[in-house]
């Protein structure tokens, strides 16, 4: 109740108890009927009945108020449980938030690493795509070259086919010529045989053949022409040699083209190096992005600090709200104390004179109305406080809902990030698969290009060999054709000169032999030159082919080495970049964790210092309040002692005067009141019996209620009202006095916080009873102030356990202690009119049927032992 902002509940109980005790005091302080000369017993009876009715009405009001208090307490306990649950949920949400922040940071680090990896993979893919494009360009270039080479090969094949056709035609001609030569040889043999036969007859025919010499000279001219034809054929051979030299030059040009291709490959390698430089620049850009992410992380840390500051402000506002509630509670208590002090002063003033009793009764009624108004105002304050607490609870619930929604948003964001991570991983896997496919395609293209180059080289070698064989065969055929032509010409000349050259045959034969020798020497020299030229050409072709093959192999090896080196460098740089970025991220994470740990330790130290300062201030305030309270209590005690002394002196004087007046009147009135008194006593005894039965039933119900409300029922703190009332026979002698033994128990310091116990702890009724005894009794019955002591207990503690503020307020009880007296059990004899008459006649301090005494002793007070009553 006190923790949740119901500081006026205790003050509610106090005014009610005050009102009840005031009513009790108003009718218990009334003087006995012997002192009232003008009044009558019937008026007193009516007033007593009215007071009993008022007490019953007040009891019903108290029962309703207690029911309302029970409901409000249940509602308050439910609200406390809700608040505790809300605080627990807030703590859990804070822990979850911290865990989510840690997970978020880990996910952000993973996301950044995956992002960097994805960027690197995209760069590698772009690099591979550029390489693939270059390879495709090279492939197109090689395809164009292959198409040109295939066209050249096709043209060479066509030329070879034409040459083969020509060779076939030449072979056919050679076969036909061979046949003709064989025929000519046969004819020659026949002619030689015939020439040998006719050689004998040449002498006879020399003269005939002189005419043929002219023809032989013509044949010599024809032979010169044949020699010129041979020279022309030699020139043709030289032309063919020049064509072959041109082909060699073409091969040299091809070699130069290959060197140009080598330079282009080197340029591509330079381009790759430039791309590596660009990749390094992109890595620098990635470093800048990492720095930007670090800046964003610092901004998030700042936002977190602002959030913490706002939360601290909210906690400070909550503490100020609690302090205001405490101040309201203290103000209500001070107001109740002031009203209590005013009531005490008014009660002591009312007891001064008989005439002031009526005015005091009216004033008390007015004050009861004021107390009811105060009660209504306090109830309105309580309703306002309840509304404020309900609003704060609604705010806390809305904040909890907001935190839950934020937690749900964070979980959804985390799930989205996980999905994005999965998609990124899938894209990375697909990119890796594409990369592998592209690498396989590149390797297959390289293998195909190598195979095609090897095939082209083999085809070129084959074509060169075929060309060489064809050239050799053509040269051999040409030689054979030349020889055959020469032989045919010689045979023709011989056949033509047969008839003409008979005489000059020997000379001509010698000349012919010399010319044939010369021709043979020339042919031999030409053949040797051709053979040397062929050998040199073959050697040149072989050396150039070997050089070309070596050069191509070296180029391919260099290209492979350059590509491998570029790949290795790229992989090494990539690993270095990844490792450096990982190291940077780890360093940043470590720095951030260290910073957060330091900030947390600083915040904890600051909070501890603030708590210590607050505790010191609180202890100093408590000490100052205690000192002020003790000084006020001392002042009040001094005032109260003075007032008591004055009231005692006045009461003694009044009693002396009244006793002398009452002695004369009492004897006259006793006779008249005997019969009425007996009837009234019987009625009152019957009513007392009924009320005792009712009280026993109510006690049983109250005990059952206590058992239902708590497992450990509190100790009975009720005042036993079952007193044995007796009118002793010693009253006839006038020496006995009726001593009232009021036993007051001091309240324990550790009282339960239930409002029912607090309602019983109000000591106003006890003070009123003591005042009644002072007014009704003699000087001897006035309590000694030495035997009384006032004890006040008021403590206010603030305990902080793990940041939570728990507040305990011990009850403040003001009790009057009296010397303990043993309870004496007396047997109540039956009342008889004679005993009553004797008792009233003999004693100077007459004790007739005083309604105030009856109420004080509990004979007509049905609520003396009731825990919900006013005492």
Swiss-Prot record:
Keywords on record: Cell cycle, Cell division, Coiled coil, Meiosis, Nucleus
Q: Which GO terms describe its cellular component?
A: nucleus; synaptonemal complex
Q: Which residues form a coiled coil?
A: 58-304, 331-608
Biased region (Basic and acidic residues) positions are: 729-741
Q: Which residue stretches does the UniProt record annotate as biased composition, category Polar residues? A: 18-40, 719-728, 831-847
Compartment list? Nucleus
Q: Where is this region: Disordered?
A: 1-40, 708-741, 778-871
Q: Which GO terms describe its biological process?
A: cell division; homologous chromosome pairing at meiosis; reciprocal meiotic recombination
Q: Could you tell me what this protein does?
A: Required for chromosome synapsis and normal fidelity of crossing over.
Q: What is this protein called?
A: Synaptonemal complex protein 1
Please report the organism this UniProt entry assigns to the protein. Arabidopsis thaliana (Mouse-ear cress)
